[in-house]
Amino acid sequence: MFDIVPIRIFGTSSIGVFLATNNSVTFLPPDVPEKIDDIVRNTLRTTVARLTVAKSPLLGIFTVVNDNGVLLPPMVLEEEIRLFKALGLNVEVLNTKYTAISNLILAGNKVALVSPLLEPSVRKVVADVLGVEVIVDTIAGNPLVGSLAVLNSRGVLVAPEATDEDLKKLAEYFKAKTDLGTVNKGKSFLRGGIVVNDHGALVGDETAGPEFMRIQQVLG
């Protein structure tokens, strides 16, 4: 059963900027209403951890997570790092000039597509902490690879700017089906509107019927 549930957080359908998940835990900001905890547990079938990065609720922008580990940006606070480590995941702070690291890394459990913008010295850390093979590439010539696609072990949903060539490459990299899709009535910033793992997906509440169907086809 792969459920797709529409939600709104802090008055916006851009839920993916606030949440991040793998197959066992979902990161939520401290001020999200309790009822969202239940939706997360029932849909993504994970535990819930309430966290911040640099006191910000933007966990979906400032973390990269898979089933093996979590990457954090340079401005994360020591006490926050301790809370991430308490979850039992590999945790590492990336020594990079970038803060919105989720825009630069599209991470599965075996492979991570990494933006050419990310410093070469950081790539090895990505590989080690997430336990993945690192591939450096763009999507449709855009280096913000983590913002233009979402994935689980079954599929990769990619923004409509992607070419057939992009879809073919991504299918090869991640060994999964790929297709184009949007969220929240035509938005191609997929990471901003979809929070997905192998069990289910949360989507922004502006997501339309055909978008639901495509998400189900590719990721469900």
Swiss-Prot record:
Signal peptide: none annotated. One of its GO terms (biological process) is cytosolic ribosome assembly. SUPFAM superfamilies: Pentein. Keywords: Initiation factor, Protein biosynthesis. InterPro entries: eIF6. The keyword Protein biosynthesis applies. SMART domains: eIF6 (SM00654). One of its GO terms (molecular function) is translation initiation factor activity. Belongs to the eIF-6 family. This is Translation initiation factor 6. The gene is eif6.
